[in-house]
């Protein structure tokens, strides 16, 4: 984590992310479809069911097929479910105020709610790294934070100090093949998708106005290079073919987790 912090501080102080520094293989999005859903605020792809977990800031989170048909729903002891992610073989949900709880995918409670360390957090999106760290994005104050599995703070970054400021971060996903962090910034910010390396270097930014307004959630299906972005305005989820930023000359990425039902 010290290496991560040094890399981030280096980006902030030296402004390393310039057009000349970007690799030849840059972030690329190509829209493949869209469907309507009621206020999709947070997304997570589940390869076990070949579907999406969706939180919409209410008391219930739902699992839907990739066509938008509901498969099941879960509730928690939190006042609402603002963000959702998969942690191992279960779910981790957040209320948006720093509270979290673990549930089975059948909705059984695995433990009481717990709070993230470090004071109040306007948690908009959550993801779990390969090493078990909980990564959150917050928009008031504007932060990207790393916690251990129990909620202890490890590292926190002010995203306003990035070479390209991230002012209204909402959703976060991690590409398991690269470790890259994919974060959407809503329309009060830049209405963009940001891509960070696993070490915290800002790799790319893609404007999303061509596809929708007010992005809130993001999920990745690495087995098919598919990305899902939820837009609040219009209440739609847009699907994309997705190519991550890679160093020049890199071999194509191997497939990641895909549908286990087929």
Model regions and ranges:
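A short loop-to-beta-strand structural motif that recurs across blades of beta-propeller domains
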Residues: 60-62, 99-102, 143-146, 192-194, ...
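Beta-propeller domains
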Residues: 55-67
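A short beta-strand motif characteristic of beta-propeller blades
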Residues: 27-35, 69-75, 109-117, 153-164, ...
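Beta-rich, blade/repeat-based domains predominating
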Residues: 35-49, 77-88, 97, 117-133, ...
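Bacterial N-terminal signal peptides that target proteins for export
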Residues: 1-12
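Short loop/turn segments that connect beta-strands within beta-propeller blades
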Residues: 65-69, 104-108, 148-152, 196-201, ...
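Conserved beta-strand positions in repeat-built beta-propeller and related beta-rich domains
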Residues: 36, 45-47, 52-58, 92-98, ...
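Blade-level signature of beta-propeller repeat domains, shared across WD40, Kelch, NHL, RCC1
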Residues: 216-260
